[in-house]
């Protein structure tokens, strides 16, 4: 109990003694349905942004079904399980994958994994914001679906990226996420990545349909961040636990990911020009 009390005291100190100045660095990935390639996109984007000489923190928030560490073939030490059970503070979970790319991994298959409630998400974001000025961008990979834990993360993030595909079910689920955010008066930027496109027209048509529906029925504006082509090599790298953009740098998919990474990096940089750094925990 003494150790737990010390953790709570340290958490409150972080919350009260640090001036958590507003920034626009925290970006959450969501998809609505599974199978859109959200984690593949987010992990490869994180790597691509880090290669642009930007420092990236990636947090895998897929509660008890995390797989970013599996995709990277990394054995995680401490995970978000340790945070949500009060064993560790967030900065103690950081795995330094490369100098400019750090990860906080989740865990999978824990029978006692606590369901992240609103108060836990609030504590999580207090600590994320205490870390954010050590990084140029913080990427959050949420779980599939529209559960309250996922929506809470999206509402707390500065910007959201919806990863969808041309499949009608995926587009509808993306629309539902936008509807949830709209009903909760979320004012952050909402961007879309169309994954698994057959060609450029496929992505354009998909985005236009989603954008028109969001604007007409919800009065919401969404922006196209990128289009990623379907490539059957992707599944091979996932099975081999290899990072696609690192192994196949000259493919069309990798170039599209890099283009999307540059665009996102520029958006974040412009949004944060007037926000200086503060004290570091690292």
Regions found by a protein language model. Give the residues of each.
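Walker A/P-loop NTP-binding active-site region of P-loop NTPases
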Residues: 26-90
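Extreme N-terminal, non-catalytic leader segments
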Residues: 1-33
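P-loop/Walker-type NTP enzyme "switch/lid" segment
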Residues: 61-133, 238-243
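Conserved catalytic-core segment of NTP-binding enzymes
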Residues: 137, 142-226
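Beta-strand-loop-alpha "switch" segments that mediate conformational coupling across diverse proteins
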Residues: 216-245, 257
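NTP-binding/hydrolysis catalytic cores, primarily Walker-type P-loop NTPases
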Residues: 239-282
């Amino acid at each position: 109990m003494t150790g737990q009390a010390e953790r709570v005291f340290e958490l409150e100190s972080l919350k009260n003694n640090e001036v958590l100045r507003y920034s626009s660095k925290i970006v959450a990935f969501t998809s609505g349905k599974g199978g859109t390639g959200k984690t593949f996109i987010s992990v490869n984007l994180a790597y691509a942004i880090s290669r642009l000489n930007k420092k990236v923190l990636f947090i895998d928030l897929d509660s008890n079904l995390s797989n970013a560490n599996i995709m990277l073939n990394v054995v995680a030490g401490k995970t978000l399980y340790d945070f949500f059970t009060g064993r560790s503070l967030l900065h103690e979970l950081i795995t330094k994958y490369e100098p400019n790319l750090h990860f906080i991994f989740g865990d999978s298959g824990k029978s006692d994994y606590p369901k992240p409630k609103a108060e836990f998400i609030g504590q999580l974001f207090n600590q994320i914001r205490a870390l954010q000025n050590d990084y140029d961008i913080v990427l959050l990979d949420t779980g599939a679906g529209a559960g309250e834990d996922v929506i809470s993360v999206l509402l707390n993030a500065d910007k959201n990226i919806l990863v969808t595909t041309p499949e009608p079910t995926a587009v509808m689920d993306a629309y539902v996420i936008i509807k949830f955010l709209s009903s909760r008066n979320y004012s952050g930027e909402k961007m879309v990545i169309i994954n698994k496109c057959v060609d450029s027209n496929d992505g354009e048509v998909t985005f236009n349909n989603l954008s028109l529906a969001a604007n007409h029925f919800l009065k919401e504006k969404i922006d196209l961040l990128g289009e990623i082509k379907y490539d059957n090599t992707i599944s091979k790298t996932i099975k081999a636990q290899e990072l696609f953009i690192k192994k196949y740098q000259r493919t069309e998919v990798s170039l599209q990911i890099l283009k999307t990474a540059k665009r996102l990096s520029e958006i974040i940089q412009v949004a944060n020009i007037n926000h200086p750094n503060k004290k570091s925990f690292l």
